């Protein structure tokens, strides 16, 4: 079932369309879950270059001989690589139209990731509210889970962002009041 409010294209002239991915504030529905595809297979280059770029020189991530002698018996993908790729997979839908990222919370690394693993992500909308200080924008919180090709959860985190509204209310307090059933001003 397609929701007509989740438009990925805008018609710029008759018969001509432009990609316009990403949710606006009105599109976020608490409880909805978005599966992010395609998956992303982690390569040795991803792991080593990203580890060194971030100055993470732990040999478990960049020295195959060292890693072979550990409990993992192979290079372990840096948690920053895992986080970056899983978070990046969410951008097209969750934050392509965002005004700003406000923060990440409750980051949990649930299982190791290795070169050759393919990661998939899904995001559940947890909360949303109009911004009281920034008319035309709202604050949205989401929970993202990353899984490997076997369905094993490898990472999860909460993320809060500032989202633009398609049709901003003239007074954000009025919108909050309406959402609260007329009780916000009392």
Question: What positions do the PLM features span?
Answer:
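Hot-dog-fold acyl-thioester-processing enzymes
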Residues: 2-104, 155, 166-186
